């Protein structure tokens, strides 16, 4: 849950085995401030090396930006089961980075994120990029993976607790984005 009356720093993560997007925002009252975003890109190598790159990259980002909470896009079931499993492993590396720093992790579906940020759960990537740019008063559209991560953080900042909130103590919470 978001504490009321104080600012909070949120790291949003859009997990991917090849490209993991990240975005950091701060919420102070109803004000959202952009702090940074980008992508952790893995080399074409074995799965363990790619997962380590994701874990190490997000660990650096957490140390640099000091978020208090983490919002992660939930894995959707793909037509290709192998792709779904690989994406789940990338997501696991991302969650592990947060848990190593004793941060609570909140999950949101793509539908929840798009509904919260764009007002349409079936919005196109370009619409998400445009709304993220406007909500955070950016000079240009962020890259798609970074925009998705920022949108996830914005969804959480808007008061969502996600389908599952995984705290360090494995305490489950339920809720959703407004």
Swiss-Prot record:
EC number(s) on file: 3.1.21.10
Listed SUPFAM superfamilies: Ribonuclease H-like (SSF53098)
Sequence positions that bind Mg(2+) 2: 73
Chief location: cytoplasm
One Pfam family, short name: RuvC
CDD domains for this protein: RuvC (cd16962)
Cofactor(s) the record lists: Mg(2+)
GO biological process: DNA recombination; DNA repair
An example Gene Ontology molecular-function term: crossover junction DNA endonuclease activity
Record's subcellular location: Cytoplasm
One cellular-component annotation, GO: Holliday junction resolvase complex
Keyword Metal-binding on entry: yes
Catalyzed reactions per annotation: Endonucleolytic cleavage at a junction such as a reciprocal single-stranded crossover between two homologous DNA duplexes (Holliday junction)
Keywords: Cytoplasm, DNA damage, DNA recombination, DNA repair, DNA-binding, Endonuclease, Hydrolase, Magnesium, Metal-binding, Nuclease
Superkingdom assignment: Bacteria
Positions contributing to Mg(2+) 1 binding: 14, 145
Active-site residues, Swiss-Prot/TrEMBL: 14, 73, 145
Keyword Ribonucleoprotein: no
Cofactor stoichiometry and binding remark: Binds 2 Mg(2+) ion per subunit.
Top-level enzyme category: hydrolase
Subunit (UniProt): Homodimer which binds Holliday junction (HJ) DNA. The HJ becomes 2-fold symmetrical on binding to RuvC with unstacked arms; it has a different conformation from HJ DNA in complex with RuvA. In the full resolvosome a probable DNA-RuvA(4)-RuvB(12)-RuvC(2) complex forms which resolves the HJ.
HAMAP family reported in the protein's UniProt record: RuvC
Family classification: Belongs to the RuvC family.
Role: The RuvA-RuvB-RuvC complex processes Holliday junction (HJ) DNA during genetic recombination and DNA repair. Endonuclease that resolves HJ intermediates. Cleaves cruciform DNA by making single-stranded nicks across the HJ at symmetrical positions within the homologous arms, yielding a 5'-phosphate and a 3'-hydroxyl group; requires a central core of homology in the junction. The consensus cleavage sequence is 5'-(A/T)TT(C/G)-3'. Cleavage occurs on the 3'-side of the TT dinucleotide at the point of strand exchange.
Protein name (Swiss-Prot/TrEMBL): Crossover junction endodeoxyribonuclease RuvC
Gene (UniProt): ruvC
């Amino acid at each position: 849950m978001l504490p009321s009356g104080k600012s909070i720093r949120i790291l949003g993560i859009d997990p991917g085995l090849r490209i993991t997007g990240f975005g950091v925002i701060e919420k102070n009252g109803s004000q959202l401030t952009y702090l940074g975003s980008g992508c952790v890109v893995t080399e074409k190598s074995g799965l363990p090396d790619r997962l380590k790159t994701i874990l190490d990259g997000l660990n650096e980002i957490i140390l640099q930006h000091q978020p208090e909470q983490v919002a992660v896009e939930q894995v959707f079931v793909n037509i290709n089961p192998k792709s779904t499993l690989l994406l789940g492993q990338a997501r696991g590396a991302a969650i592990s980075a947060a848990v190593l720093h004793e941060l609570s992790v909140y999950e949101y579906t793509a539908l929840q994120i798009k509904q919260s940020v764009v007002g349409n759960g079936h919005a196109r990537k370009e619409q998400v990029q445009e709304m993220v740019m406007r909500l955070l008063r950016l000079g240009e559209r962020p890259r798609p993976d970074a925009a998705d991560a920022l949108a996830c953080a914005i969804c959480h900042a808007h008061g969502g607790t996600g389908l599952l909130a995984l705290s360090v103590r494995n305490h489950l919470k339920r809720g959703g984005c407004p």
